[in-house]
From Swiss-Prot:
Pfam families: EFP (PF01132), EFP_N (PF08207), Elong-fact-P_C (PF09285). InterPro entries: Elong-fact-P_C, NA-bd_OB-fold, Rib_uL2_dom2, Transl_elong_fac_P/YeiP, Transl_elong_KOW-like, Transl_elong_P/YeiP_cen, Transl_elong_P/YeiP_CS, Transl_elongation_fac_P. This is Elongation factor P. The keyword Ubl conjugation does not apply. Involved in peptide bond synthesis. Stimulates efficient translation and peptide-bond synthesis on native or reconstituted 70S ribosomes in vitro. Probably functions indirectly by altering the affinity of the ribosome for aminoacyl-tRNA, thus increasing their reactivity as acceptors for peptidyl transferase. It comes from the Bacteria. The lineage of its organism: Bacteria, Pseudomonadati, Pseudomonadota, Alphaproteobacteria, Hyphomicrobiales. It is found in: Cytoplasm. The keyword Kinase does not apply. Pathway: Protein biosynthesis; polypeptide chain elongation. PROSITE patterns: EFP. Gene3D superfamilies: 2.30.30.30, Nucleic acid-binding proteins (2.40.50.140). GO terms for molecular function: translation elongation factor activity.
Length: 188
């Protein structure tokens, strides 16, 4: 489907020169003089190479047809990550470069959204929040509860984040999958 460059957004998949690209950032720039342009940074799906393109906002760009489906995460092995479609029980293998930096947040039986182009996974979307356990942090110090500063902590998935001073080892917390930031104590 052909669309104008100014309508491209993060997460769209573009077809260019016979290859698919996932849009990482898309910014419309309106200089004081000259023609407005769309600055688009994207990653080639086939090999992970990042490129940056600049289009006039009125240029036509080919946006690929993408289908989103819910899949359940099963396991990870040397070949990649394995998911199952809950509707028809088909299993699909997703390469590590498609999963990218969200891999530590994948948990067994987690439902994720996979974006498919001609039945090939091109992008993954995790739930916004995930519950993890603190496995390493500084001990709780009395009298620090009113402080707004965070202390470093290691989570059960191996990711480091900042947590409030009252959080101790063994506490289950909710973090954002986008950036790993602390949200709240888990309510379970």
């Amino acid at each position: 489907m052909r669309v104008i460059a100014s309508s491209i957004r993060k997460g769209n998949v573009i077809e260019q020169d016979g290859k698919l690209y996932v849009v990482l950032t898309a910014e419309n720039i309106h200089p004081g003089k000259g023609t407005p342009v769309s600055q688009i940074e994207m990653r080639r799906i086939s090999d992970g190479v990042k490129i940056s393109e600049r289009y006039k906002t009125t240029d036509q760009v080919e946006r690929a047809t993408i289908e989103d489906h819910n899949f359940t995460f099963l396991y990870e092995d040397a070949d990649g990550f394995h998911f199952m479609n809950a509707e028809n029980y088909d299993q699909v293998q997703v390469p590590k470069d498609v999963v990218g930096n969200v891999a530590p947040y994948l948990q067994e039986n987690m439902v994720v959204k996979l974006s498919l182009h001609e039945m090939v996974p091109v992008a993954i979307t995790l739930p916004q929040r995930v519950t993890l356990e603190v496995v390493e942090t500084e001990p709780v110090t009395k009298g620090q509860t009113a402080s707004s500063s965070y202390k470093p902590a290691m989570l059960s998935n191996g990711v480091r984040t900042g947590v409030p001073p009252h959080v101790a080892v063994g506490t289950r917390i909710v973090v954002m999958t986008e950036d790993g930031s602390y949200v709240e104590r888990a309510k379970d």
